Amino acid sequence: HEVLPGVEIGDIGPKLGYMAKENGYLRFKDIKLPSSALLSRFWEISKNGELITKGNPKILYSAMMKVRIFLLLASAQALGKSVAIALRYSCLRKQFKDSQKQEIPIISYQLQRYKLFPLLARSFAMLSTYKKIKDIVNQTNIEVKQGIFKNFQETHILLSGSKALFTSWALDGSVICMQCCGGHGYAQSSGIPGIMQTIAPNTILEGENTVLFLQVGQFLLKNARYIKEGKIERVSNHCKYLTQLFESEQLIDTFKIDVSTVN
């Protein structure tokens, strides 16, 4: 098959991870497209060249919520797998001898436990948190279909922060698990490098984590401003705890908190 004149297609090439999915590009040169061929379900361009949005943009974002929910589960599962590999290795791998001249499994060393046990607990916490957030998102999507957007922003922030936190935890935790396995962890046969390659793109796709963390920060500061101005009724349910912060003037002075410029 050959493309038509003026049409260029190609593959973007190898990536760090997500190799099972092919990503390509499409380029048009000196081609006129009729407006009827733009597949414009949610947008259209008028005869004057103006972009017109159809429907509520929030409904479009609700589709992204489903992908971010999947990323929460994938992150929890990935960290759990990495921890399981590292713990099993630590129980079998022996290093140095005790007073009885018996080699000691490295899981007996305090440093190994210090690095792995919190990750084990975190993986279970991530799974339970994922289930709770999934229920919240599903309920919000039901409300959105009914034209109710009361809880939409709060759900968006909750999911954005969770996506950034979970994907960062999964990748950083898998690196620690690899290090806990020494040279064996670096080998592809350990399984951990493959996990890391799979989840590495998750910190970027569906919202780069730094941007998502900043969105959460802005949301918190906005609610802090409401509290400072006495507009308690506008404070998000998830931010009620911030009222305790403003009960302590000393704490405010310590951190030099200024919420007056937050939009």
Predicted regions and their residues:
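Flavin-dependent oxidoreductase catalytic core characteristic
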Residues: H1-N263
